[in-house]
Amino acid sequence: MHIARRDFLKYGGGTVAALALPGGLAAADAPRKPIIDVHMHAYPATMKLPVPIVNPITGVKSSIVTGADHLTACLEQMRRYNIVKGVVSGGDGDRLQAAYDWHDRDPERIVAGAGIRGSEDTPLPPLDTLRSAFASGKLKVLGEVTAQYAGLSISDPKYDPYLALAEEFDAPVAIHLGTMPAGTTFDPCCRTARAAFGHPETVEGALNKHPKLRVNLMHSGWPYVEEAEAMMMLYDNVNIDTGALSWLLPRPAFHDYLRRLVDAGFGKRVMFGSDHMYWPDGIGLAVEHVEAATFLTEEQKRDIFYNNAAAFYKLAPAAPKALSDAGTSRPPNG
């Protein structure tokens, strides 16, 4: 599947809608058992999103315009699919505040994470800022860590103080791994990004320097399945999430990758993560594609959707309020 980065992140397009399989998951058919989404994204409330927001798989246009609209639409999707906990990534500065805004909007549902990069144009935030946030309880997760976009691996010494901080506060670390949209390295935002730093094995140095870490290899390290398996085999403090491949890949390709991981014995280490980015409806597509995996038992689906993340992220059981409003529905900007 070839989608240029600018088109992928901004406009999507009906030209790739044929990649989606027919039969959307309507709200009435959505799973009613609770789900944890460990891979969500927040944007500043006043940020103007590139319009129109068009889902790159379905071609459906969204009416959202700002980061505030995006938050409202994502929370609606979470209620619709009974996602009772969501780990949301915000970047430095305003985007870090965006993660806090999500939490303030629905504190029982949202877990705030700090996205860090370490490139020249997106430097690492002051360590004291994160220390204070972890100490206050505002932050619970370090991630998404996008060292790959900085042309580095998480094992680079510049990240050591941040990983030590995560160890100190027993905070999970979520690391971007795998590949990136076509053309990423030619985008002014990401000239330092390199595919070579997406290999799961690049995490190994950090795991040995910081053995108390709990690490989520995001996107399941796709397409490097053997390396993802090797890391989980050797390090029992490593889990993976499904990430954007759960809805951006054609369903058969995603299922083949997921089946490989489960058949290899890692069904207790895979966590659901939608990685919806600009597209709130990507959340539902991701849920649908896991639900449609007929090779999974119901127990395995519950592990992926809830149990594995609840254990790894040490999340409390779903609050009754979160379950009671699971079927509500309102317009995305309502």
Predicted regions and their residues:
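Mid-to-C-terminal alpha-helical segments outside catalytic/metal-binding sites
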Residues: 2-19, 31-38, 47-48, 54-85, ...
